[in-house]
Amino acid sequence: MAPTMAETLLEQLNTMTVTVADTGDIRSIETWKPRDATTNPSLITAAAQMPEYRDIVDGALRWAEDKAGGAESKRIVALAIDRLAVEFGLRILGIVRGRVSTEVDARLSYDTEAMVQKGRYLIQLYEAAGSSRQRVLIKIASTWEGIRAAETLEKEGIHCNLTLLFGLHQAIACAEAGVTLISPFVGRILDWHKKQSGRDSYPPADDPGVLSVRRIYDYYKKFGYKTEVMGASFRNMGEIVELAGCDLLTIAPNFLGELSKATGKLERKLDPAASSTKDIARITVDEAAFRAMHAEDHMASDKLEEGIAGFSKALVALEKLLTERLRVLRGQARAGHAAQEFFKVYDLDGDGIITREEWGGTESVFTALDINGDGRISVEELAAGLGAAFHLKSA
């Protein structure tokens, strides 16, 4: 049936795809009311700078200080980061009907046992607060070690979201491991191909990121895998439109806003019935095959390493923010803005500008901070505040 004039693209998308809010800003989640929400260190760092969330930050630090029992500040901050992620997750679960994704420290991405222990610990925090593990996805990078950690956690009833996924070999390994959900990064795949080809743009239907998600979706539906596909990291509306029908799409507030205003007929582009009839060869992906395929896929190997580095930098920035706030709570420093310290974390070449490549974290936060839209963040723009810029993006 053709849509009525009142049906926006977002309303139509919601009939065929689960929309997920890619934000840690509780106000944005209240506005868009998605079924699920995802968070990561970049988003939490942004949200933690907003005055309205100061009580969550301070509460996490006080809780960590009590738990640490006189330990040094580094240990307190480490505990507070986990607590803060869970506290934001709990607030989000009070709004959404479905699930929230909470990320394991990206610096553990090649340590299977450490990721298993961290996943268990995060779930313990959620359950101690009265939340069901069925509503939480533990987000882990799609390294071979991360996939093995997720396999262990899934067997314990701890559901996982495998992120930083760029290649079919990663997707197949995740499905074989019984992972609940994967997050292929559409926009970052596009970024790599644009840089390699020198092209400024691709038609949405030929966007390399879109084609990658379609291939994964078709493979999963062809062979009956239960793992859900959640497209992530979008650069433009065209990518979202071309993936209508995907199991889930995690969308930043600015694109949710555009979708809620746009009208016209939205065609379903991905359909399980159509995928099941396609001629697709089954691929075996054991560890040797995974590592060989990953080495051959320069895009996937480049972007996975870059993504882990980016999320790790975001954690360093969050650690600096919490360390400074802990000093304030102890009366050892005045409340101030940590912009200069954050800037040093990301300005790798010390030229006074943060490029998208140097940032490496969540695109929606980068775009929000890039107030003049020139593709670079100056110290003045960062000094405007992660939180303030984040609200500009979600308004």
Where are the predicted features?
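Primarily EF-hand calcium-binding motifs
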Residues: G336-D349, G361-G373
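Conserved, mostly hydrophobic/aromatic
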Residues: N40, T102, I138, L153, ...
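N- or domain-start disorder-to-order transition segments that initiate the globular core
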Residues: M1-T23
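Active-site beta->alpha loop and helix N-cap motifs at the rims of alpha/beta catalytic domains
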Residues: L43-T45, M50-W144
